Amino acid sequence: MAHPKFITCGQSDELSRAVTQLQQLSWQSVQSQADILLLPVPSFNDSGSVKGGGDLPSALNALKEDAWIVGGNLQHPTLAGRKILDFLKDPVYVAKNAQITAHCAIRLAMEKLPCTLSGLPCLVIGW
């Protein structure tokens, strides 16, 4: 079996050591030892599948029983009885995420518009 590949952001000795260690293991051994399953935020599309793909029941079966499931909008029947942390129920997370979304929307508008935003009526709304 091929070794897993990891993409990381940031640089630190700890991160380098962790990536080296993880690259030497199989996915099964990493998954069976994991304390946390981090899902996308929001975690599921309208059909109930994990956004971005993946087989949730198989992933859950391979995890330790007491592993945390972390993501957003985690009201999914497969997660019943699991320890979950739903970022989208945290008002601080939601506010910070809205701030970042608004910042990016304004930046994109500034790049695409043929004029400045100064004096223009502008409303930034989220999801």
Q: Which positions does each model-derived feature cover?
A:
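Glycine-rich adenosine-cofactor-binding loop
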Residues: 6-22, 116-127
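Short aromatic/hydrophobic-glycine micro-motifs
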Residues: 24-27, 82
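Short acidic low-complexity segments
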Residues: 26-35
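Glycine/serine-rich phosphate-binding loop and adjoining beta1-alpha1 elements at the start
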Residues: 39-118
